[in-house]
């Protein structure tokens, strides 16, 4: 110890107290990497308030924010997937289903509700991407057909929010059959003179994009959503060419005429209510 240390008063070294912040309070935008307050992000419908990047939102949260609060009823909730093929790859299909159900709280990858949209009668469907990549299974097809039948029965418009990797390989031909099944149901809806608005969100690929997602009377994309059949990496490897900038993004598809509109998620409720009111020859109830 030096002579200076002997004459100077001893100071206590204190370490700052650690505050226990619960997990999940903060999150990071996957586009701009800004740290965001989780509650604020949820109020903003999972759209980054800094850069407007549209993050993925759960099927149930989407429908609950889209439809009027009063009078919402779920359709086809009792339908549950079955492992009829006893399929097994690196894991048993039965185990994949159990894990997905535990993670999402849903029985399968499509949630269907009927209700009103600013007073306009509607049936709305939303894919849950966290459930095995939003893949189309027999239950997804059955629920979608139920949605169409309910629309025809009660004269309601139909809206579907797609986000999917395509057909569910663990169900083989049972899954592929849903492409024809859902397309045939939409033909019946069209013959009944009722509108179908398809909203393609990030990502909408494979058998879903090749069937129900692209059959809307009006096809809407969310900003910068990846939309296509095969993914861009697969296409590049096949054609051995560099793809154009923004290829398969909703802005590219709008420019080429593959979709009709791009609508910000925060404006979706008002814009679609206005469109459906015109198509059903009714009026919107202003809030």
Curated annotation (Swiss-Prot):
Gene3D superfamilies named in the record: 2-enoyl-CoA Hydratase, Chain A, domain 1
UniProt remark on cofactor binding: Binds 1 zinc ion per subunit.
Pfam families assigned to the protein according to its UniProt record, in alphabetical order: Carboxyl_trans, Zn_ribbon_ACC
This protein's record includes keyword Transferase: yes
Protein residues bound to Zn(2+): 29, 32, 48, 51
Pathway annotation: Lipid metabolism; malonyl-CoA biosynthesis; malonyl-CoA from acetyl-CoA: step 1/1
Zinc finger intervals, C4-type: 29-51
GO MF assignments: acetyl-CoA carboxylase activity; ATP binding; carboxyl- or carbamoyltransferase activity; zinc ion binding
Annotated catalysed reactions: N(6)-carboxybiotinyl-L-lysyl-[protein] + acetyl-CoA = N(6)-biotinyl-L-lysyl-[protein] + malonyl-CoA
InterPro entries: AcCoA_carboxyl_beta (IPR034733), Acetyl_CoA_COase_Trfase_b_su (IPR000438), ClpP/crotonase-like_dom_sf (IPR029045), COA_CT_N (IPR011762), Znf-ACC (IPR041010)
Record-annotated CoA carboxyltransferase N-terminal domain positions: 25-287
GO terms under cellular component: acetate CoA-transferase complex
Listed EC numbers: 2.1.3.15
Subcellular location: Cytoplasm
GO term, biological process aspect, one: fatty acid biosynthetic process
Cofactor(s) the record lists: Zn(2+)
PANTHER family listed in its UniProt record: ACETYL-COENZYME A CARBOXYLASE CARBOXYL TRANSFERASE SUBUNIT BETA, CHLOROPLASTIC
Function: Component of the acetyl coenzyme A carboxylase (ACC) complex. Biotin carboxylase (BC) catalyzes the carboxylation of biotin on its carrier protein (BCCP) and then the CO(2) group is transferred by the transcarboxylase to acetyl-CoA to form malonyl-CoA.
Subunit structure: Acetyl-CoA carboxylase is a heterohexamer composed of biotin carboxyl carrier protein (AccB), biotin carboxylase (AccC) and two subunits each of ACCase subunit alpha (AccA) and ACCase subunit beta (AccD).
Family (UniProt): Belongs to the AccD/PCCB family.
Name listed for the protein in its UniProt record: Acetyl-coenzyme A carboxylase carboxyl transferase subunit beta
């Amino acid at each position: 110890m030096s002579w200076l240390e002997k004459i100077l008063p001893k100071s206590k070294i204190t370490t700052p107290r650690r505050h226990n912040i619960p997990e999940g309070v903060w999150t990071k935008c996957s586009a701009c990497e800004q740290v965001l307050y989780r509650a604020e992000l949820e109020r903003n419908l999972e759209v980054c308030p800094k850069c407007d990047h549209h993050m993925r939102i759960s099927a149930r949260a989407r429908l609950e924010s889209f439809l009027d609060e009063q009078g919402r009823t779920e359709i086809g909730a009792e339908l549950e997937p079955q492992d009829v093929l006893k399929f097994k790859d690196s894991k048993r299909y039965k185990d994949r289903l159990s894990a997905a159900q535990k993670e999402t709280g849903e029985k399968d990858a499509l949630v269907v509700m009927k209700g009103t949209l600013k007073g306009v009668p509607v049936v709305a469907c939303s894919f849950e991407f966290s459930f095995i990549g939003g893949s189309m299974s027999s239950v997804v097809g059955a629920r979608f057909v139920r949605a169409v039948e309910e629309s025809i029965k009660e004269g309601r418009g139909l809206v579907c929010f797609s986000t999917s990797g395509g057909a569910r390989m663990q169900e083989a031909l049972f899954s592929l059959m849903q492409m024809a099944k859902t397309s045939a149901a939409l033909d019946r809806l069209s013959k009944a003179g009722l509108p179908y608005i398809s909203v393609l969100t990030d990502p909408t690929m494979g058998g879903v994009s090749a069937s129900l997602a692209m059959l809307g009377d009006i096809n809407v994309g969310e900003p910068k959503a990846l939309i296509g059949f095969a993914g861009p990496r697969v296409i590049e490897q096949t054609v051995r060419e560099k793809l154009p900038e923004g290829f398969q993004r909703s802005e590219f598809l709008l420019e080429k005429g593959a979709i009709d509109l791009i609508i910000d998620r925060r404006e979706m409720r008002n814009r679609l209510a206005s469109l459906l009111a015109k198509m059903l020859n009714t009026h919107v109830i202003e809030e």
